[in-house]
Each structure stands twice: as structure tokens, then as C-alpha cells.
């Protein structure tokens, strides 16, 4: 889940997707040709479709382990006079939001688990930026829970800028372009097969004006989503989860929920199985169609909705009695989760190919999973109902 050929998410960068849904120790979302559509759902977003096939590289500094978590990973120029409140810039406020999201989710998970604590790893980069991984394993309720945050400063080549701005004046030939990227990403795997897995990720990317073209426009975009992967369907749980996502979306635009729900269904598709990883949620990418302030507020609202969408379901299901059969089915569905992340997830596959920070890249994987040869649940069973919903996505609300 969670290095670029910007030096990799660890730190070099061959773009293949502007925003992979997962977040690593460096900006893994910088891994695709900018503005290049890559799924049907992306096409439905009515984005431009230039044909760029080049590969580019960018540079960021190598991360260095540190012993304590700083108040912020921002450069001093991005922080203003009060680090705790941060500057009025979108960079500063998004960085603050992703730290608060990590803290609040970790506290909620520890409380729900009843005793286990997160292990924390922190790193920084000499020129600014850094990251913080929080991972809980073998708790009373959670088999594995990871919540990662990252801030990256780097430089992209002019080819990437031209791809991002195909309508710019062709006579403008900008030089290397500094960029900023920040995000929070999490995957939560409970032990009880009746409690669902949850993934969420929210991120922001911004360029500075090119060094050789100070008048050129600055680029920015948001991406992210929250999705839900149960092993067994409790309709009240699925409706609750989707209702919280819809409520967050509807505060900003009534078109967001249906648009982003479809995008989520399309993205989390396991092609070789012809089924979805789970029961959906919301997903958006390369998103700058609206005012920047509005989209910052929208991303914040979505991140703040994670706990009310998920924790009540975990509290309801964590102590439900289960059998070995239930656990085996959960492990088979965990196998599907592993397949998607290692084969299709853009952040994971990019990080593995570019020598990224492996512990952050693989933090999304469950501790245990299972594969059985030619396993098919009997039609009409609870297991079959879940599989059918993954093959034939439904409208839950």
C-alpha cells in the first residue's frame, strides 16, 4: 500500500498514475503520466485525454530515521509563525489535517482494541518533508492496523509539467519544477470475520511555478477515498457505511457520491477474478474541478467521517461468535485483498518496482490470508451472497 523514481515512495519516479489510491513513504501517487485516463471511471470524470507515453524521473531526498515525531514535516517557509495552527496555505492546512486524521484514527483503534498500542516509525528528509508510520499488530480486536502519513518535497522534470498543462503556450519551456505532496493512508484488518476491513487514503499534490518560467500557472489536485471490505454482509452495516460517505459528499455537491461510488467500484476491480475487492465506498483522483478551498474542506470532511463510518460497526461485530468455517472464508477474502494490492494497486506495485520503504509499502497486507484450489461457495449461502455482491455491485442506499 504505502517509494518514487522521485528517488523512490522511497525516491525516483516513473509516472504511471497520478494518484494511486495507496500512500507510501514517498509520493507514490506521482507514478503515472499526468492527466492520463486509466479506467472507465476516470473517463466518466470527463478529464482531458492527451496521449503521453514518455517516462520521466524526478528527484527527492532519501529519508532518514528520527527518534521523535516533529510538530510538522513542512519546510519553515510553509509553516508561518505558529506551527501548531500552521499557515493559511493549503499545504499547511492539509498537512495539519492528515496529522490530526492519523492521531484520531489511532486513538479510536486503540480504544476499540482495548489494550494494544501502535508501534511508531518516524523519518524525515534534510530539505523538508518526512513521514510517520503507526502500526498495531496482534491486538485483541485488530489483527493488523496501519496508519501512515507522508510529506514530500521534490523536483519534477519539464516533460511532466507539459503533460499536466497541454494547453499552455507552446513557447514556454519551463525547467525543473518543485512540487509538494502530502497524504494519509490506512488499512484496518479486524480479527473477527464478521467485522469488516477498512481502507482510506487522502492526499494533496501541488507544484511551484517552474524555475525558468515564474509566470507559469501552478498545478494542484486532491485525491482519495474510503472503502469497505467485509467477509460477510450485514445490510445494516453496509447501509450505515455508505450513508456516512453520502452525507459527507452531499455537504458539498449532490453529484459527488454517485460519481465517486462508481469510481470506487471501477478502481477496486480484480480483473483476473472478475470481481471487486469489497463493497465499495468512494474514490476520487486528479481532482481539481472545483475551488481549492472547497476541495480542502471536502477532503477534511471525508477524513473526519472515517471514525463514525467504521468504529460503530466494529464495536457491534467484534465479539460476535464465529466458527472455523467463518474464519476460513475471511482468510479467503483476505487472499483477494492481497491479490489486488500486489497485482493492481498502483502505489504498491510502483513501490515494489522502485525499491521503496518496504515496511510502509506492505503495511496494507493482512497478517494472514488463505488460498484454496477452485473454491466456490454454495449458491444461497452467506459466503455466496458476499461473492455475488463483489461480482455484481449493488446500490446500497
Swiss-Prot record:
Chloroplast in keyword set: yes
Chain intervals for the UniProt region annotation (Important for dimerization): 135-144, 337-372
Biased composition (Polar residues): 79-90
Active-site residues, Swiss-Prot/TrEMBL: 199 (proton donor)
Enzyme class: oxidoreductase
GO molecular function, one term: coproporphyrinogen oxidase activity
GO BP, sorted A to Z: chlorophyll biosynthetic process; protoporphyrinogen IX biosynthetic process
SUPFAM superfamilies noted in UniProt: Coproporphyrinogen III oxidase
Keywords: Chlorophyll biosynthesis, Chloroplast, Heme biosynthesis, Oxidoreductase, Plastid, Porphyrin biosynthesis, Transit peptide
GO cellular component: chloroplast; cytoplasm
Site positions for Important for dimerization: 272
Keyword Plastid in annotation: yes
Catalytic reaction annotation: coproporphyrinogen III + O2 + 2 H(+) = protoporphyrinogen IX + 2 CO2 + 2 H2O
Stretch list, region Disordered: 76-95
Gene3D superfamilies: Coproporphyrinogen III oxidase, aerobic
Pfam family, one: Coprogen_oxidas
EC number: 1.3.3.3
Binding-site positions, substrate: 185, 201-203, 355-360
Pathway info: Porphyrin-containing compound metabolism; protoporphyrin-IX biosynthesis; protoporphyrinogen-IX from coproporphyrinogen-III (O2 route): step 1/1
Subunit description: Homodimer.
Function statement: Involved in the heme and chlorophyll biosynthesis. Catalyzes the aerobic oxidative decarboxylation of propionate groups of rings A and B of coproporphyrinogen-III to yield the vinyl groups in protoporphyrinogen-IX.
Family: Belongs to the aerobic coproporphyrinogen-III oxidase family.
Protein name, per record: Oxygen-dependent coproporphyrinogen-III oxidase, chloroplastic
Organism: Nicotiana tabacum
Name of the gene encoding the protein in the UniProt record: CPX
Amino acid at each position: 500500500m504505502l517509494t518514487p523514481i522521485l528517488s523512490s515512495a522511497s525516491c525516483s519516479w516513473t509516472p504511471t498514475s497520478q494518484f494511486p489510491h495507496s500512500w507510501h513513504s514517498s509520493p507514490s501517487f506521482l507514478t503515472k503520466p499526468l492527466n492520463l485516463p486509466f479506467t472507465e471511471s476516470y473517463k466518466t470524470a470527463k478529464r482531458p485525454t492527451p496521449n503521453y507515453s514518455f517516462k520521466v524521473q524526478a528527484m527527492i531526498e532519501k529519508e532518514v530515521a528520527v527518534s521523535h515525531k516533529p510538530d510538522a514535516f513542512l519546510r519553515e517557509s510553509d509553516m508561518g509563525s505558529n506551527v501548531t495552527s500552521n499557515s493559511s496555505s493549503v499545504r499547511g492546512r492539509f498537512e495539519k489535517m492528515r496529522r490530526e486524521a492519523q492521531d484520531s484514527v489511532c486513538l479510536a483503534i486503540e480504544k476499540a482494541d482495548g489494550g494494544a498500542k501502535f508501534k511508531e516509525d518516524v523519518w524525515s528528509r534534510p530539505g523538508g518533508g518526512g513521514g510517520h508510520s503507526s502500526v498495531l499488530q496482534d491486538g485483541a480486536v485488530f489483527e493488523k492496523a496501519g496508519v501512515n502519513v507522508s510529506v514530500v518535497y521534490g523536483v519534477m522534470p519539464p516533460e511532466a509539467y507539459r503533460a499536466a498543462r497541454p494547453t499552455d503556450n507552446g513557447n514556454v519551456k519551463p525547467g525543473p519544477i518543485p512540487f509538494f505532496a502530502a497524504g494519509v493512508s490506512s488499512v484496518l484488518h479486524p480479527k473477527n470475520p464478521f467485522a469488516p476491513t477498512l481502507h482510506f487514503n487522502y492526499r494533496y499534490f501541488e507544484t511551484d511555478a517552474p524555475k525558468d518560467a515564474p509566470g507559469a500557472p501552478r498545478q494542484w489536485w486532491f485525491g482519495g477515498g474510503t472503502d469497505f471490505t467485509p467477509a460477510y454482509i450485514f445490510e445494516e452495516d453496509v447501509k450505515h457505511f455508505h450513508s456516512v460517505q453520502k452525507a459527507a459528499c452531499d455537504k458539498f455537491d449532490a453529484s459527488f457520491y454517485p460519481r465517486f461510488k462508481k469510481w470506487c467500484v471501477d478502481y477496486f476491480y480484480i480483473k483476473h477474478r472478475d470481481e471487486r475487492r469489497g463493497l465499495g465506498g468512494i474514490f476520487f483522483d486528479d481532482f481539481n474541478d472545483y475551488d481549492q478551498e472547497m476541495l480542502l474542506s471536502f477532503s477534511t470532511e471525508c477524513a473526519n467521517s472515517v471514525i463514525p463510518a467504521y468504529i460503530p460497526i466494529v464495536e457491534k461485530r467484534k465479539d460476535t461468535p464465529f466458527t472455523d468455517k467463518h474464519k476460513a472464508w475471511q482468510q479467503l477474502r483476505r487472499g483477494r485483498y492481497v491479490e489486488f494490492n500486489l497485482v493492481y494497486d498502483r502505489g504498491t506495485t510502483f513501490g515494489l518496482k522502485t525499491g521503496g520503504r518496504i515496511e510502509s509499502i506492505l503495511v496494507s497486507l493482512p497478517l494472514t490470508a488463505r488460498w484454496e484450489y477452485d473454491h466456490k461457495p454454495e449458491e444461497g449461502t452467506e459466503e455466496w451472497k458476499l461473492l455475488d455482491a463483489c461480482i455484481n455491485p449493488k446500490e446500497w442506499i
